[in-house]
Amino acid sequence: NISVNVPELSDGDPTTCYTGTRKLNRIVFDPQYSIPVQSYKIYSSGESPVHDPASWVLKGSYDGKNWVVVDERNDQRFCSRYQEILCPITNPSNYKQYMLEAETAGSDTLVIGDVLFSEKNLVTDWEDFRYPAVDFEVLAPETKGAAIYADLVQDPDTYLKYHARKVAEILFYTAKDTMNDVQTIHYTLKDYDGVSAKSGNPPAIYIEYSTRHIEKSANESLYKLDFETRGVLYHELVHAYQFEPKGIGSYSTNKEFWACIEGMADAVRAESGFFDMSTRKP
């Protein structure tokens, strides 16, 4: 069976999913493209990782009859729920249609959150980004929040590295720009009242995230927790990569210094799409 123009795959909302079959699934995207697609993203859903696509082939066609392999991926693993895998296309062309052939690693039903195509090569200028090492630690493994976090994030190292680059992409033009040399991110899940906090300066950054806040955020849904966790992480990672104002005191002694630091972090969080505008305070 072939599915055509599945609306849930192009709405930019990974909570609305394509649910396929246990074997190879074929999905055709037929909006009659006029400009070559240069990269695409596949998103995991909120379902268990066993339902994620693990291998896929993207094909292009000029007439809907003859198909050419455009990109092929095997042994793929999503680092979290609602997570993208970005795939550049090596030899783009004026294909009018695309077909995705995908399947899971085992014999489980395939579920995909989104498939989004771009007329830009979204990897350009960032291939040489220097990813920091990650030291991930759970100080309160017995808490409900720690267990919920594990349901959301399957590979914390890759998850944190992904967000480090996303922050840099907003703050800078290319990976070759001068930026703070963040070599290691120490990320800790901790049982305390609060949300999150960053300490230290490059090359070593320390971020803690409250398991109690995780529990609270997950009360509504796993997607709400995902939204909050990414938003908080964007904010804290900006503090790792942003430059500080000069000649106006310090974070604790000058309100303009504080406003610059925190305002930039919130601005990047908003730009990334993970800022709940309904919670804004005047």
Which residues make up each language-model segment?
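Extracellular/periplasmic catalytic domains that process cell-envelope and extracellular macromolecules
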Residues: 91-94, 128-130, 178-181, 198-203, ...
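Pan-zinc metallopeptidase signature
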Residues: 123-124, 282
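Auxiliary, metal-adjacent structural segments of Zn-dependent hydrolase domains
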Residues: 150-209
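Acidic/histidine-rich, surface-exposed loop or edge segments in extracytoplasmic proteins
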Residues: 128-154, 211
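Zinc-dependent metallopeptidase catalytic helix centered on the HExxH motif
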Residues: 190-277
